[in-house]
């Protein structure tokens, strides 16, 4: 981000060009923090965090609940294409937790309309947790992983765009059975 909190293409290109970075994921939403941004207290913003995040050392680092670079499905896809280009062609995609199914369908429709496809989509389950999420939201916001993954796969398949991207899962996938059951979808 630049000092105003907006996307900085030059800084992104510089960072994404690092050899260790193999792909770029845009976090649209997360099951445990639906509709919430985050605050890293200034006391935890040391010199290294300040350098990496591009924020002043010792000041609260506020991550907004939304992206300033896009606000519609079409803009999300255009932004995905832009970061793919700025990263030198590295795979680019996004992560989201299914909340309102019609919103995911709108993204699918925008793929068809624009002919822009992410390289991957990561479906996060409502049961995914984070220490930064409100306790009331843990395990209760969005669609659980299995249902969300199945919905996304079927929506992409039904719209004829599933073959354009990989679909991955993110949530409480901790055992061999969890992995096998998601792969079976």
Residue ranges of predicted features:
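Active-site-facing alpha/beta catalytic cores
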Residues: 1-110, 117
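Glycine-rich phosphate/ribose-binding loops and adjacent secondary-structure elements
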Residues: 67-185
């Amino acid at each position: 981000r630049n000092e105003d909190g907006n996307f900085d293409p030059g800084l992104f290109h510089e960072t994404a060009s690092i050899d260790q970075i193999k792909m770029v994921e845009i976090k649209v939403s997360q099951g445990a923090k639906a509709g919430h941004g985050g605050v890293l207290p200034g006391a935890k913003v040391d010199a290294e965090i300040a350098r990496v995040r591009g924020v002043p050392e010792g000041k609260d680092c506020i991550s907004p609940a939304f992206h300033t670079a896009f606000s519609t499905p079409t803009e999300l896809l255009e932004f995905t294409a832009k970061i793919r280009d700025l990263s030198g062609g590295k795979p680019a995609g996004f992560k989201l937790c299914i909340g309102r199914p019609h919103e995911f369908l709108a993204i699918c429709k925008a793929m068809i309309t624009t002919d822009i496809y992410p390289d991957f989509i990561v479906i996060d389950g409502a049961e995914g947790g984070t220490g930064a999420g409100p306790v009331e939201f843990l395990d209760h916001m969005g669609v659980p992983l299995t249902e969300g993954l199945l919905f996304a796969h079927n929506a992409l398949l039904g719209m004829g765009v599933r073959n354009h991207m990989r679909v991955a899962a993110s949530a409480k996938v901790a055992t061999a059975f969890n992995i096998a059951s998601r792969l079976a979808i």
